[in-house]
Structures are given as C-alpha cells and as structure tokens.
C-alpha cells in the first residue's frame, strides 16, 4: 500500500521541481533575450544554478518516494540533511551580519539617513572597489530618482522633507542633511556660500552634483542606502529561511518514514 509519507514527499518534491523548472526557464529566457538589462543579467547564472539544484534534488526525492527506489531516497535524504545544516549555518550568519545598520533619524525629516560605518564590515564589501561601479550604473539604469522629480511634492521643500524616502532615494538622490544645501526641487540643490565645515566633516557635500545622471551616486551616503536596502532584503530572507527550515525538517522526517516504507515493501515483495 502506498503510504502517506511517500505521498507527502512525492507531492512536496513535485512542487519544488516545478519551481526549479521555472527558474531554469526564466534564466534561459534571460540568456537569449536581448532586451534584458545588465543588472538583470547578473542574476542569470545564480538563478540557473539554483534551478538546476532544486530540480535534480527534487527528482531524486520523487524517484525515491513514488518508485520506491531506496538508493535514490537515501541519496536524497543525505543531500537534504546537508542542505538543512547549511541553511541553519547561513541563517545564523545572516542574523549577525545584518544585526547592525539601522538608519539615523534626522530632526524634522520624514526619512532616515544612512552611513556606511553603521553596517558590518562584511556587508560593506558589497559596495567596495569595482563592485560599486557596476551597482552605480544599475542605479542610474533603474532611474531610482525619477519618482522624486514628479508631482507637487518635488517642488515644495516642506512637503519633500516630510516625504518617506526609500534608503536608496535618501542616500543617492539628495545631499546629506548636514551639508545644509538649499532646496530648489527634489533633485536640484544649491550649496551654501560658506560650507567649509560641512565639507570637511562630510565628503559627500563636495561630491553632490546637480547633473541629473550623477546626483549623489558617487557619495558614501548612496553606498549606505544600497547597504540598507541589501540589509532589509537579507532580513526578509532570514525570515524566509526560518520558514523553509521548518518545511525542510518536516519533509526530511517524512522522507525517513518513506525510506522505511520502501525497505518494508521490498521485504514484503521478496517473501
């Protein structure tokens, strides 16, 4: 008789196979499609690799549970156990490297501002050296500051100051508040006539440009905004990993039962 545990493992892995096949299909689409941007193309190989791993491991689970192939099931359980351990280690690592990096509240502003020193050294490596050149071009390509240039809010200083900006918009689309620039519109600011102290304390004051393709994309504040965005995504990933761990442990337990069912079925068939 086909056991419940075999059915659960087979069903779960069939669904994961579909996810893996979708990832493979989308990555192939990005390889052959000419309209994909450089930023989007950066995820092609990781997406293809992840899709292949999910598909092949799940295929082992389906073969082992549905066709009662004990070797396939044992191989699947070994890989799954290794994945659970690796995911646990990765989740603990994520918790510690994203523990720092909360934005700084600015008096009279509806947005926060960020500094690279507030983030872990490991996270700062994401925006260091040549990596930043690629990220900066992606930000310009994505037109992250265009939303600030539209509407009445972009023309009124008080309305802009109370706007809830994203970390990237706060760091890349305006000068830091301590530079004391004069607001003209959301992406055009006039430096004060005497700002030597602010420039000395914050190098971003001299880096700001009213050229719309540059703005503060070369500022450390922009790097910090990107780091804040990465930190937020990784904190969300941490929550996802915890849920995934619960699911994988459940599937692993069902897999162990399915393996025992396979052995029992083989003994019954041999009698």
From Swiss-Prot:
Topology Extracellular: residue spans? 29-44, 98-236
> What is the top-level taxon of the source organism?
Eukaryota
Segments crossing the lipid bilayer: 8-28, 45-65, 77-97, 237-257
Ranges per topology, Cytoplasmic: 1-7, 66-76, 258-271
Q: Does Transmembrane helix count among this protein's keywords?
A: yes
Q: What Pfam families does this protein map onto?
A: Tetraspanin
The subcellular location is:
Membrane
Could you name the Gene Ontology cellular component terms for this entry?
membrane
Q: How does it sit in the membrane?
A: Multi-pass membrane protein
Q: Which UniProt keywords apply?
A: Glycoprotein, Membrane, Transmembrane, Transmembrane helix
A GO biological process held by the record: auxin-activated signaling pathway
Subcellular location, principal: membrane
* Chain positions carrying an annotated carbohydrate: 185, 195
**Which family does the entry's similarity section mention?**
Belongs to the tetraspanin (TM4SF) family.
* Primary role: May be involved in the regulation of cell differentiation.
* Listed name of the protein: Tetraspanin-11
Q: Which organism is it from?
A: Arabidopsis thaliana (Mouse-ear cress)
Encoding gene (name): TET11
């Amino acid at each position: 008789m086909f056991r419940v545990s075999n059915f659960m493992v087979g069903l779960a892995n069939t669904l994961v196979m579909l996810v893996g096949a979708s990832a493979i299909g989308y990555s192939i689409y990005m390889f052959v499609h000419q309209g994909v941007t450089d930023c989007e193309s950066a995820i092609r190989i990781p997406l293809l690799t992840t899709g292949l791993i999910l598909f092949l491991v799940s295929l082992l689970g389906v073969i082992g549970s549905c066709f009662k192939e004990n070797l396939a099931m044992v191989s699947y359980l070994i890989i799954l156990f290794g994945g659970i351990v690796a995911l646990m280690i990765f989740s603990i690592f994520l918790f510690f490297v994203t523990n720092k990096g909360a934005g700084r509240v600015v008096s009279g502003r509806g947005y926060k501002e960020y500094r690279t020193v507030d983030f872990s050294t490991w996270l700062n490596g994401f925006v260091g050296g040549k990596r930043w050149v690629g990220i900066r071009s992606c930000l310009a390509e994505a037109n992250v500051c265009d939303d600030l240039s539209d509407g009445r809010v972009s023309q009124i200083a008080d309305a802009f100051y109370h706007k809830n900006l994203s970390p990237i918009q706060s760091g890349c689309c305006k000068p830091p508040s301590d530079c004391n620039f004069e607001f003209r519109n959301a992406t055009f600011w006039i430096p004060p006539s005497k700002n030597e102290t602010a420039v000395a304390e914050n190098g971003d004051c001299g880096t700001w440009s009213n050229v719309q393709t540059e703005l503060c994309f070369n500022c450390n504040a922009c790097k910090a905004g990107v780091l804040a965005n990465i930190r937020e995504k990784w904190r969300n990933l941490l929550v996802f990993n915890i849920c995934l761990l619960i699911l994988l442990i459940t599937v692993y337990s069902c897999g162990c039962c399915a393996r025992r069912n396979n052995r029992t079925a083989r003994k019954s068939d041999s009698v």
